[in-house]
Amino acid sequence: MTYNTKAYAAPSATERLGPFTLSRREVGAHDVQIDIVYCGVCHSDIHQVRNEWGNSIYPMVPGHEILGRVEKVGNQVKQFKVGDLAGVGCFVDSCRECPNCAAGLEQYCRNGLIVTYNGYEKDGKTPTYGGYSTQIVVDEKYTLKVSPNLPIEGAAPLLCAGITTYSPLRHWKVGKGHKVGVLGLGGLGHMAVKLAASFGAEVTMLSGSPSKETDAKRLGAHHFVLTSDDAAMNRISNHFNFIVDTVSAPHDYSKYLNTLDTDGVMICVGAPPEPTPIPAFSLLLQRRSIVGSLIGGIPETQEMLDYCAQHGISSDVEIIPIQQINEAYERVLKGDVKYRFVIDIASLKN
């Protein structure tokens, strides 16, 4: 059984998003039905809507930073009750059997992660639709509890931007005594600054925009380096233990690899659509590394949400009605948002 839900969808890679009606499954024994209140706008929404990664399925309902209230629960649900704040991130199921799923690393499921949108359910036929919609039904195992201590609109982007930066910082045990460079001050970058600073690291913002210095320091950065200033970049050669690279546009890795100290690690969490050349000698000469990281598993995402609630950390957001989503996409591409658009889903219900 299914029921209809209002949404906004992209009909194709070249058309504007507009009103759409989708079908959600009725609540099963282990399901939670969430009345969506806010949904963040991730840069990857744009990549996928425009088929920049070459795997898009249409019509597409984007959105994987979903925050709302539980409206219904299945008769076997144990962790949620009606009225609870709940979140849904970048995936809604996994195989539940592979070593990574067993270890709480569902994002690296080896047998087929079920992404929140632009994918298919386990039957291989039913498309998944995201949070640019009024409701969603998800198994409680893949649903996150959200503290009422968090501002609900600022909590939504934590489901992607928050965990995408939290997970690698925790994996590499970043903390006091470490020097961390954050490349790019956008949705991911501003969370990387906040989190790295909260862990006790000395944080430097690396940006090509001098106008971002004041904001970077307000967010918690201790230093700011203008990447177009060659002299300033030379002064930080062999300096950082870690760089968190959040940039989704093509950029020159060698410029930043040379700022890493011996055994320094460049953590890539942005997803440029085109391959990037890697200069071998920038790695060889100081035993530097380039690594990647993809969001986080359910246990770690819950840990991140709890940590943010305890430490008063949330995303800086601009709330928009869904009718402005196409204009918002253009503003994201221009860097004209501080620092995450969040859709007020009430605008879709009217």
Describe the predicted segments one by one.
Residues T2-Y3, A7, S254, I298-N350:
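C-terminal hydrophobic helical "lid"/dimerization subdomain
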Residues L260-D261:
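Helix-to-beta-strand junctions that scaffold the AdoMet/dcAdoMet cofactor pocket
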Residues C95-L183:
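NAD(P)H dinucleotide-binding glycine-rich loop of Rossmann-like/cofactor-binding domains
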Residues G264-V265:
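Glycine-centered, small-residue-biased loops immediately flanking beta-strands
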Residues R25-C39, E52-A102, Q107, Y129, ...:
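Glycine-rich beta-strand-centered segment in the early N-terminal region that forms part
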Residues G189-H190:
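N-terminal Rossmann-fold NAD(P) dinucleotide-binding loop
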Residues K176-L185, L195-K255:
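Adenosine-nucleotide cofactor-binding segment
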Residues G270-Q286, I298-D306:
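Rossmann-fold NAD(P)-binding glycine/threonine-rich loop
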